[in-house]
A protein has these predicted regions:
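Class I S-adenosyl-L-methionine
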Residues: 25, 52-62, 69-215
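SAM cofactor-binding core of SAM-dependent methyltransferases
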Residues: 1-53, 64, 72
């Protein structure tokens, strides 16, 4: 199974994927280096993920995209005015990719982002702290792990290192460390979504069928 992992960051979503051939696209060279170190068998490409999707979407069996979330986040909106922050336009690449995939992608896909400060322009599936746009059904619960409360702790980065099973302090680039750590998808949620897309969850089992939402 060929998988495209866009805006791959450090591969939080990808950690528990197995039996697949992954191409990861990340624009930040330092994140790409650490991703390759973490997943040496993946193909890692330093490039614009938005353009890469347009050029290569037909080559994969499953596509995961996590476009940058800061311009959509409630935290950024609530922080307006603090420390001289000015309002900014939401980055519409998120919705460009959703619309493009909805109309042109024949394989399974998942677009992930934060819950925004506005009403989502395209209906999504809300799970925990994230929204997901998919062309397949998702279980009502993606993970038994709980992130809540970590961001309020004094040792936030340390707690996030423990939660994601990764030492984020390896990162020596220009991005803010705790933001990178906060934005990583829970690896159990990533596995549940991937396994669902691949059809591992048996939808003929009535116990499984009952946990699926309608598209």
């Amino acid at each position: 199974m060929k998988v495209l992992n866009l805006y791959a960051c450090l591969g939080g979503n990808r950690l528990l994927w197995d039996n697949c051939e992954v191409t990861a696209v990340e624009l930040d060279p330092e994140l790409a280096r650490l991703y390759q170190e973490r997943f040496p068998n993946d193909t890692v490409i330093v490039a614009d993920a938005h353009q890469y999707l347009l050029d290569h979407y037909k080559e994969f069996d499953f596509i995961w995209s996590s476009p940058p979330c800061p311009t959509h986040s409630r935290a950024r909106y609530w922080g307006f005015g603090a420390n001289g922050k000015k309002p900014i336009y939401p980055d519409m690449k998120l919705y460009q990719e959703i619309i493009f995939l909805q109309h042109h992608c024949k394989t399974k896909y998942c677009v992930e982002n934060v819950i925004p400060y506005y009403e989502p322009l395209i209906p999504a599936k809300k799970r925990d702290r994230h929204l997901y746009w998919t062309n397949f059904k998702l279980p009502n619960s993606l993970s038994d792990r709980h992130f809540e409360g970590i961001s309020q702790t004094k040792n936030e980065v340390t707690k996030l290192c423990e939660f994601h099973d990764y030492d984020f302090r390896k990162y020596k680039g220009n991005q803010v460390l705790n933001k990178i750590a906060r934005n990583l998808v829970d690896y159990e949620a990533g596995k549940t979504i991937f396994d669902t897309a691949r059809g591992i969850i048996n939808k003929k089992d009535t116990k499984q069928t009952s946990i699926f939402d309608e598209l």
